Amino acid sequence: MKIRPLVPAVAAAALCLPLAGGAADNPKFSRNEILIGVLTDMSGPYASLTGEGDVAAAQLAIDEFGGKIHGVPIKLVSADHQQKADVSSARAREWIDRDGMDLITGLGQSALGLAVQGLASSKKVITMNTGAGSPDLTGSQCAKYGIHYSWNTHAVAVGTAAAVVDGGGKSWFFVAADYTFGKSLQDQATKVIESKGGKVLGGVRAPLGTSDFSSFLLQAQGSKAQVIGLANAGSDTLNALKQANEFGIVKGGQKVAALLMFITDVHALGLPVAQGLQFTT
């Protein structure tokens, strides 16, 4: 099994739990065990970034820590959130109310990450988002028991957008994921673009898990924008880039900027498809 880019964050989530336990001389845990739940994408567009790799790395972290804290064994469970906030909330509620969950991690999608964080915090259970990127996790919907680990949409959007505009990419058209994450990426990038004298000519929203981006890319191509910004991630980004290559968008003179990209994505695409791509990581 290959260890994916977001996996080290999940490992860190498992290791952070001792900090809470060490605060007391006699820490108490559910049913005399430390129960960690990895709620992740096992079958959807983010499975290659999270999924089974998340679970494997969390288990590695537990093993490396000796499998116990203060003599209390650590148990790991996992589930597929199916990219649905209601499914995630139901699973989290079951874990907390029935099993006495101590920490829920993973949550690699903003809408469900926010939903589970709110639910868990109301029950005084820690969540550590390692994949969701919405700034609302620590902003408007900040929760006492919620931890947002790693990046957020402000950081990744601002870095790429600023560099591309400074390099001459003044006019933009966005192809964004049609949920909180995509909207946030586009909004954050737009602020930077406009602050630097650039313009956003338009944008379209593609449903999460889209396989055919042709209609969205044709609109972007027809906008004559200098830069087509991809405000998505995972297989959505890969599918959009493969089809952009088929349409000859970069060869035609437009730039493509991916706002969230990992080196493993570049490897998956291959150099002929990825060349000319603008991104920061």
Give the label of every model feature segment:
Residues 1-35:
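Short, low-complexity disordered leader/linker segments with a strong preference
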Residues 24, 29, 33-35, 48-54, ...:
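Beta-alpha junction/loop-to-helix N-cap segments that form part of ligand/metal-binding clefts
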Residues 32-51, 171-175:
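Short beta-strand segments enriched in small/hydrophobic residues
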Residues 45-56, 180-184:
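Glycine- and acidic-residue-enriched helix-capping/strand-helix junction motifs
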Residues 65-71, 122-125, 193-199, 246-253, ...:
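Short helix-capping segments at alpha-helix termini
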Residues 75-79, 201, 278:
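General small-molecule cofactor/ligand-binding pocket signal
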Residues 90, 135-136, 143-247:
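Extracellular/periplasmic Venus flytrap/periplasmic-binding protein
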Residues 244-281:
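Extracellular/periplasmic periplasmic-binding protein-like sensory domains
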